[in-house]
Amino acid sequence: MKDLVIGDLHFGIKTNSIAWLTKQIAFMEKQVMPLIHNHDRVIFLGDVFDIRYSINTQVGYEVKNMFRKILDSNPEVKFYIIAGNHDYYSPMIEFEHYNAYELILGEEFLKYHTNLHIAALLPILDNRTLMLPWYFTENDERYETTMKEYQGKFDLIYCHTECQHWSPEKIKLKGNAMVYAGHIHYPYVDKDNKLFNLGAACAFTFNDVNSSRYIYTIDDGIITEAYENITTPRFKRYYNDRIFTLTEDDLVNTSTQLCISPDNKNKAKYRERIKEIKSTYMDCDIKVVEWVDDQMGYDGPTANISTNIYEYIQQNIPSHLDNKFKKLTAKIS
């Protein structure tokens, strides 16, 4: 089977930002939809929605219309959505019946679009491919029972889990099957045990800094193509002298931090270059950040915790509080 596989999308990210929603829908229309007809199946690896306990009406409406358009345009292709932790009302297993897909899509939608299948309450087995909802990988007892029930019936698993933390016992239960998972937003590869987190389909915060995001063709269990997301915003950091060689391609459609050391921030050539960049690319989200080697000299999921907290607030603060936040941080700095 030739599958188009899509990692976490998190529609409703940035406190239901409509600007972000527009970019994400554009990504689906411009980059995903043209690829679908060349595949047998389309697999969503979970967390299609972001805010598990409350889905914004406009977000739900736009995403439902997007799915309707995709499904109606590709009646011969089978679509599978695997529920992730953000797709359930609660992370507690006793609330697993409350999920985003039944709420937003509804029973009539699913009855009409017979080529859409949701793995939220039970696993789905299709052509030796086992699709496991969040609760079936994160609950060890359920996982073990499921592996034994379907033993010998699958060669490929799609799910929503953190493969890096799978125990030897858990790996052994799956046998020789390839595992491709959503949940972790950056790629993780364990070739020896055939475990792969594919990463999110979009970059969302500065935890995703300076790295691209992809969707994939997986043909009979093997990745054969990777398609870079060039539609939704990228997150970039550039340090000190690098600001003097920045081009339009480095800055357009990005959230960018110019990381300048205390020794450089007051130098005239740096001040002039920063002023030039901001005036030339006024539509870009460009911020200047003081860079200290022992705090911010590296990027990614393990970055300095105080920096991460600042960035989280910066990226998620409601718009009506943004000016107050900027004034407060200006006083502190």
Task: Briefly describe each language-model feature range.
Residues 6-7, 41-47, 78-85, 117-121, ...:
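Active-site neighborhood of phospho(di)ester-bond hydrolases with catalytic His/Asp-centered motifs
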Residues 81-172:
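Conserved catalytic scaffold of divalent metal-dependent phosphoesterases
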